[in-house]
């Protein structure tokens, strides 16, 4: 009995465990089947999606391929059309060439037949001409060559007579027309250029506020006046003229330097030899700058471009030069404008003519090489500073020193004469006076050791400044005598000329 109680629970436990295992297995199998079905469904969906993607890509690729094939077919068709058109054109051209060739052959055959006919007629005419010539020779008693010569001589005489008559008519008409046209051009040129009548003097009047300043300008025992005259080379005349000091000298540049220096000294109030030298040095630089500025303004006003800076400086320096009393810069501007107008009237280049007119008297500016005519010196300067050959020739030929090679040269010559020939434009006595003073200075400068020379008091005194390191005190007297003798032998002058040789030694030190 007890054994039954033990066996029954064990059997029950075993049966329960078996049932539980069977139930678990059933559940697991059901879950497995469910998961398998889900996996199969998902696999089917994925498969369908992939199939759709593949199909879509296939359709896209197919469409692209069909499009490319269509485009290629279109290109092939276009090329085939062009080839057919070209072939048709070539066939038409070939037919046209064949037709023209046939026409040429026909014309050639026709020409050949006509040429044969002409040749035959020519032979007949030659025979007939020969018969006629023989007949005429028999009648006239002259050969054909003799008859030709007589006819040629007769025609020559007749042609010469007619040509001579025709040439005379042309020459007379040209003379009348040329004279009339030349007068017309000159009158038109003068009318179109406005000018002023200006005569350069050899003195400048410096006005002062009161006569008290005269004493300060003169200085103790005249030392300020002497220092100013030595520094500028200008004679300072202080007389009884109220509120005025006269600056006398033939060189306008020196007079302008003296005037500006006096103006600054009077304004500053400090007037003594050291200050005078300082101011004169400063004013010389100022005048040089003004010369360059004047040259630049002149070329800009006239529209002349591309000049060398040294030529521009020389043009500015013309402001302080005169020719027979006529201001050289005004004369050059006037000549340039006249040249431009006359060149325009003659159908030539007015810019080149104006350039040549402006530069024609440039040889009067340099102080060196005085033995050369100013036209030749001007031509050399233009060549040196790379002016064109026609400009150089016009400058050199305007006084007939060289041969005129272009039409610019006679224009410059005529306009120079027109400018100088105006009533009141020039005064030859002034030019002769200035030339005499300049020759006086150049004569003294030719001696070794001479640094500067100044002709003052209308050429009655010549001051010669020598280098202290080159000439001693004993030689100054000999130099003065030699210069005086050379002036007596080589120059013509009124009265007498006083030669003053100045030798000055300076020792300068600075206290620091």
Swiss-Prot record:
Membrane topology recorded in Swiss-Prot or TrEMBL: Single-pass membrane protein
SUPFAM superfamilies on file: Eukaryotic type KH-domain (KH-domain type I), HD-domain/PDEase-like
Q: Indicate the family of this protein.
A: Belongs to the RNase Y family.
**What would be one Gene Ontology cellular-component term for the protein?**
plasma membrane
Q: Any idea what job this protein has?
A: Endoribonuclease that initiates mRNA decay.
Q: Name one GO molecular function term.
A: RNA endonuclease activity
Organism of provenance: Parabacteroides distasonis (strain ATCC 8503 / DSM 20701 / CIP 104284 / JCM 5825 / NCTC 11152)
Q: Which InterPro entries match?
A: HD/PDEase_dom, HD_domain, HDIG_dom, KH_dom, KH_dom_type_1, KH_dom_type_1_sf, Ribonuclease_Y, RNase_Y_N
Known EC number: 3.1.-.-
UniProt gene name: rny
Any one Gene Ontology biological process term? mRNA catabolic process
Coiled-coil stretches: none
Question: What keywords appear on the UniProt entry?
Answer: Cell membrane, Endonuclease, Hydrolase, Membrane, Nuclease, RNA-binding, Transmembrane, Transmembrane helix
Domain (KH) spans 202-262
Per the database record, which ranges form the HD domain? 328-421
- Kindly report the protein's main subcellular placement as a broad class: membrane
Q: Which HAMAP family does the record cross-reference, listed alphabetically?
A: RNase_Y (MF_00335)
Query: Which regions span the lipid bilayer?
Result: 2-22
The enzyme's main class, written as a single word, is hydrolase
Q: What is the name listed in the Swiss-Prot or TrEMBL entry for this protein?
A: Ribonuclease Y
Keyword hit for Nuclease: yes
**Localization in the cell:** Cell membrane
């Amino acid at each position: 009995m007890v054994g039954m109680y033990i066996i029954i629970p064990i059997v029950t436990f075993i049966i329960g465990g078996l049932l539980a295992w069977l139930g678990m297995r059933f559940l697991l199998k059901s879950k497995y089947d469910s998961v398998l079905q889900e996996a199969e469904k998902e696999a089917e969906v994925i498969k369908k999606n992939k199939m759709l993607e593949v199909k879509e890509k296939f359709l896209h690729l197919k469409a692209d391929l069909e499009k490319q094939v269509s485009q290629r077919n279109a290109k092939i068709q276009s090329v085939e059309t062009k080839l057919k058109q070209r072939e048709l054109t070539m066939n038409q051209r070939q037919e046209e060439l064949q037709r023209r060739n046939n026409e040429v052959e026909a014309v050639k055959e026709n020409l050949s037949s006509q040429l044969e006919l002409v040749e035959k007629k020519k032979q007949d005419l030659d025979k007939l001409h020969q018969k006629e010539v023989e007949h005429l020779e028999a009648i006239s008693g002259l050969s054909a060559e003799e008859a030709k010569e007589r006819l040629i001589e007769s025609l020559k005489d007749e042609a010469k007579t007619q040509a001579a008559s025709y040439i005379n008519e042309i020459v007379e008409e040209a003379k009348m027309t040329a004279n009339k046209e030349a007068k017309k051009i000159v009158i038109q040129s003068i009318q179109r250029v406005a000018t002023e009548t200006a005569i350069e003097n050899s003195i400048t009047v410096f006005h002062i506020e009161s006569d008290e300043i005269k004493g300060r300008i003169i200085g103790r025992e005249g030392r300020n006046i002497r220092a100013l005259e030595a520094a500028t080379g200008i004679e300072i005349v202080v007389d009884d003229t109220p509120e005025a000091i006269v600056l006398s000298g033939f060189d306008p540049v020196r007079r302008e330097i003296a005037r500006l220096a006096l103006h600054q000294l009077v304004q500053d109030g400090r007037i003594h030899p050291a200050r005078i030298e300082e101011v004169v040095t400063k004013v010389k630089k100022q005048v040089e700058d003004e010369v360059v500025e004047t040259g630049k303004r002149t070329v800009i006003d006239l529209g002349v471009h591309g000049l060398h800076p040294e030529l521009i400086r020389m043009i500015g320096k013309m402001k302080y030069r005169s020719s027979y009393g006529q201001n050289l810069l005004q004369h050059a501007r006037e000549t340039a404008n006249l040249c431009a107008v006359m060149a325009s009237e003659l159908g030539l280049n007015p810019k080149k003519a104006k350039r040549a007119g402006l530069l024609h008297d440039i040889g009067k500016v340099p102080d060196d090489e005085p033995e050369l005519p100013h036209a030749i010196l001007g031509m050399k300067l233009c060549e040196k500073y790379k002016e064109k050959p026609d400009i150089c020739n016009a400058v050199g030929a305007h006084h007939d020193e060289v041969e005129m090679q272009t039409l610019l040269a006679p224009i410059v010559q005529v306009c120079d004469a027109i400018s100088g020939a105006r009533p009141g434009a020039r005064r030859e006595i002034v030019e002769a006076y200035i030339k005499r003073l300049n020759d006086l200075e150049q004569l003294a400068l030719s001696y070794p050791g001479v640094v500067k020379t100044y002709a003052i008091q209308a050429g009655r005194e010549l001051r010669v400044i020598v280098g202290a390191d080159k000439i001693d005190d004993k030689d100054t007297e000999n130099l003065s005598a030699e210069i005086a003798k050379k002036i007596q032998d080589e120059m013509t002058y009124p009265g007498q000329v006083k030669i003053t040789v100045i030798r000055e030694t300076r020792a300068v030190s600075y206290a620091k």
